[in-house]
Amino acid sequence: MKKLPYIAIRNQLIAPYSTATVKIGRPNSLAAIQFAQTGFNGEIYIFYTKDNKMVDSIKKTSDLEEYGVKAKIKEIVEQGKLQNVVFEVEELVKVKEIYKELGKYSFTSDIFASVTEVEYSGNFDILSDYRSKAKMLIEKLSNLHDEIGSYIYGGRRGIKELEKAFSANTNISPLTHDSFNVDIWKIIDALTIEHSWKEYFAIINETNLEKNYELAINMLINAIKMGKLDEEVNSTMRGDLENQQRDFLLRERLRQIKKLLKDDEAGAKAIENMEDAEENARQYPDYVIEALKTEQNRLASMMPASPEANISKTYIDLITTLPWKKVSGELLDIDNVRKILDKHHYGLEKPKERILEFISVLTYTKKENEKNEYVPVKGEENRFIDKNLFVNKTGNFLKDRVNNIPILTLIGPPGTGKTTLAKSIAEALGRQFVKISLGGVKDESEIRGHRRTYVGALPGKIISGIKKAGVSNPVILLDEIDKMSSDFRGDPLSALLEVLDPEQNTNFQDHYLDLEYDLSKVLFIATANSFDSIPAPLYDRVEFLELSTYTLIEKTRIARTHLLSKILSLNALTEKQYQITDEVLAYIIKNYTRESGVRNLQRLLDSIARKIVVRILDKKVDKEFVIDKAIVREFLGPELYNEKGDETQPKAGVVNALAYTAYGGTSMTIEVTTFPTTAKGALNLTGQLKDVMRESATISLAYVRSNAEKFGIKDFDFENTSIHIHVPEGAIQKDGPSAGVTFTTAIISALSKKAVPNTIAMTGEITLRGKVLPIGGLKEKSLAASQIGIKTIFIPKDNEKNLIDVPEEVKKDIKFVPVEYYDEIFKYIFEAKNK
């Protein structure tokens, strides 16, 4: 046979001796169509891609199916950049080879082909009998259409045309098989709507016409059976379908419909699995199975494509995927816990000690209460069914013991290891870890879920977290619990109180799930930055564990043992290419960071690593690189902070104060100046001071005025002088009473024109009688003072007991002076200086 252009198609079946429309858009196919029209009288081959491959992936002959068809272009309809091409399809052909060139025509890809003729075999008498049988079946199928109007395969028009073709073609020559071949393909073309690729290619690849005719006749018989079956279904199944073949066909039809609708009967299978499980190892509580049956019955009555059906399927999926009684095994080994905590965290001795106590109680109560019957889950390693979960008695969940182990809340500045500490607890126990971020959560539904009546409803964060964990005893971290707030949508904290109360969380009810869930096996750990923003009701339900600011030695040790190994790994550096001493690490910490944790320190060390990598690629570094202070200044720029503090001459009215914030300890300066004014006793406050701090400044001024003679400023004209108090860094809001003694000292210094040494700082609340009241965060304030070179700190007498928490390295460099009344500070600074 002659060589012609060809196009390759996928996802479309084209029968020989039929009319077919193909949408053309790819450059190769458009070129083939053009060549066929201009040089080959509209003749073209149509081939199928093998295994339904993309047309663009055709590179060789073996990428095509063995058989295709010859066709002639009948009509082309332009549709934008696409062409709808109508083909008059002729005989079946066998692909031989594909080319890029054909005579004077050529293209960048293979768009020309050569083929061989397909030779058929078959007994003329048998084929004649088959044809007579097919003609009779076609007439029967046509009559069935006339009687019931049933939609069968090709429809009324296709069957009528088929009947007409068989009636007209009466004279068949015994010398050729062409007429039988045409008849077979007309049947297939008429019934092409529902028959599969497998059947189609089975006929294409078979050259024995007798076998092909058998397949075609079977298709006709099935079409008649399906037509009669449709009649019975449409008449509400008036008769019982006792015939086994009818029953099979009906089920097959239902299966195909569900397959098209993608309805996989997941809910029904889930119920089957639940009920087939052994009684002593059943994962699902009885009331869950009943709820699932009810929901499955509702789903069965819905239209499969309706929105309600999709909502119901999602709900069923949630119920079947929640772990319910499934738990993971625990590694209750104190030595292992201690090893893991020390591996991931340096220092933090008090938090580690409390966590060991916490896990010790879990271990001991577990041994004392071995009544818990754990049944292994088949096919899942380290997964068990806890029979004591969801025990339903008289409508309430009761357990043999109450889980009275308190819920830990880790309090500390950012970067001090709260989240990693929670992960270490999960690792030590061998439990799954789930983190739930609560920062900015304002809606109660985020915790308790949305009711399913709302569009886009979802379960709350707690149930979603348990689903993600896949077990009912994970470690759940409630991160930034102090950052939640409430608005008109409800109070998420109130919903969280139920979760965190061991007396109530055995029957926690999510609005979306609408079924009680036992949270008693969940180990909740919360984190927060400060106590101030934690609501009062939460204090009764959790135990606070404070993670304080790291010292210089601790930061250096953490950098050496944890940060550097991670940074070297991330940047593919060796220890010789990143040589840094503890002295240089301390230099970076003192002069480039002001933080409680080590996050910024890690960023700086990582920045140095990246610059070393650049030098290696520029061939400026070979096998070794030593980082000294000069290299640090070159890589990180000038020093950001002065570790020796303010070395300028002390000035009257300027005093160092110490503060404790959610981000750790910090130092600040109080400035006071005076100037004449017509306003009597005016006091100006600037620097974004909030109410408590403004009141503290007012109290300090009142105390100074009432004791002016004692402080040596009795001749000062308060009535005609304005006193201005400023706290630098005015963009940052400041509050708290602990700057009272600092305000007092700064006012006395400004009015008496006597400067206070830069190496002195103080903290403490003051009363109108001059009593110095205790403050919080002494350790953090002391660490902040040590970073700026402070040598003496005045603290309240009542805080003397807290000096035990201050690291020895800080106490070695700083003198702490406990005072009960302000007079003691005045005498130390002003009178001692005069002497």
Swiss-Prot record:
Q: Which Pfam families match?
A: AAA (PF00004), Lon_C (PF05362), Lon_lid (PF22667), LON_substr_bdg (PF02190)
Query: Where is each Lon N-terminal domain found?
Result: 4-224
| CDD domains assigned | RecA-like_Lon
What the record says about the induction of its expression is: By heat shock.
The residue range of the signal peptide is: none
User: Where's the active site on this chain?
Assistant: S738, K781
Which keywords does this Swiss-Prot/TrEMBL entry list?
ATP-binding, Cytoplasm, Hydrolase, Nucleotide-binding, Protease, Serine protease, Stress response
Q: Which GO terms describe its biological process?
A: cellular response to heat; protein quality control for misfolded or incompletely synthesized proteins
> Catalysed reaction(s)?
Hydrolysis of proteins in presence of ATP
Q: What is its EC number?
A: 3.4.21.53
Name of the molecule in the record: Lon protease
- Gene responsible for this protein: lon
